[in-house]
Design a protein with these regions (language model features):
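A Zn2+-metalloprotease active-site environment signal
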Residues: 6-19, 25-254, 263, 270-283
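Short alpha-helical
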Residues: 260
């Protein structure tokens, strides 16, 4: 993927200098302190500092000055900045024209280990996610190593797909799709999972719409396209269930199968057309 390193995006909140979330600085009882000490000994991590309220969160938009960053991570921050700005610039142009509404920018929060979000605690183990309550995407950059090593989806465009998918969820929020789906899930809980799958597949397609924009500008080649398709398929529910040693149970899918995710990403990538991303048609 062709991209140009530049300044960190103004839409990024860099919290990597913070060890974890604060809990209002409330005093901790002796029992709680003992529990944190035990957890620290068991997991070999400093839970005392993390949860005692003594750690300050890095100021919005910048990392702690004391943080030492290796060159590879610096490059990764520049890369996600480029992808974020490019994706949002694309939606600045596409959404008013094809969706009939102006696009408003999401924020991207970079963190290590854990941080607070309006949707609850964001943790490394959770993976990247979009929180509609604060309109922010949360990513621990360490996930990209996992994408390569655990899920077998290396490459910069594969990494870009992950962020573009989460921005796709923000597009759904701006269009009012997310709130409608949530209301339907509340009214009929039996449809919660199928509706979730449709929402996720649509976000895959929206990521593809941005991918089409990069292709039009010769920022990606065929090998990049293949990497993006592999990334979409790598996180299908059926594959994740097999990796966890469980039987494949479509009734428990929340994101769609590998084949479905790859298919919808390719649909957006091939068309570049928002109208082609209607995963709710015929419902």
């Amino acid at each position: 993927m062709r991209w140009t390193p530049g300044d960190v995006s103004g839409d990024i909140e860099d919290r990597r200098g913070s060890s974890g979330p604060r809990f209002g600085g409330a005093p901790m009882g002796l029992g709680g302190l003992i529990m944190l000490v035990l957890l620290s000994l068991i997991f070999k991590r400093d839970f005392v500092s993390m949860f005692s309220g003594t750690q300050e969160v890095a100021p919005t938009g910048q990392a702690s000055r004391s943080m030492v960053e290796d060159p590879a991570e610096t490059k990764m921050v520049q890369f996600v900045s480029f992808v974020l700005d490019d994706a949002q610039s694309t939606w600045d142009r596409v959404l008013p024209k094809e969706g009939g509404v102006p696009y408003r920018h999401a924020k991207l929060v970079l963190f290590r280990d854990a941080t607070d979000s309006a949707c609850g605690l964001a943790q490394t183990a959770t993976g990247p996610f979009y929180c509609p309550a604060d309109e922010k995407v949360y990513i621990d950059l360490g996930f990209y190593d996992e994408l390569t090593n655990r899920f077998g989806a290396p490459g910069e465009f594969a990494q870009a797909y992950v962020l573009a998918h989460e921005i796709g969820h923000h597009v759904q929020k701006v269009l009012g799709i997310s709130s409608k789906v949530h209301a339907l899930q509340q009214s009929d809980p039996s449809e919660a999972n199928p509706l979730s799958v449709r929402l996720e597949l649509q976000a895959d397609c929206l990521a593809g719409v941005w991918g089409n924009s990069t292709a039009q500008r010769d920022l990606i080649e065929q090998q990049d396209v293949e990497a993006g398709i592999r990334a979409a398929g790598a996180v299908g529910d059926d594959r994740l269930q097999r990796m966890a040693g469980r039987r494949v149970s479509p009734e428990n899918f929340t994101h769609g199968s590998s084949a479905q995710r790859a298919e919808w990403f390719q649909r957006g990538l091939a068309s570049g057309d928002l109208a082609q991303c209607n995963t709710f048609a015929g419902r």
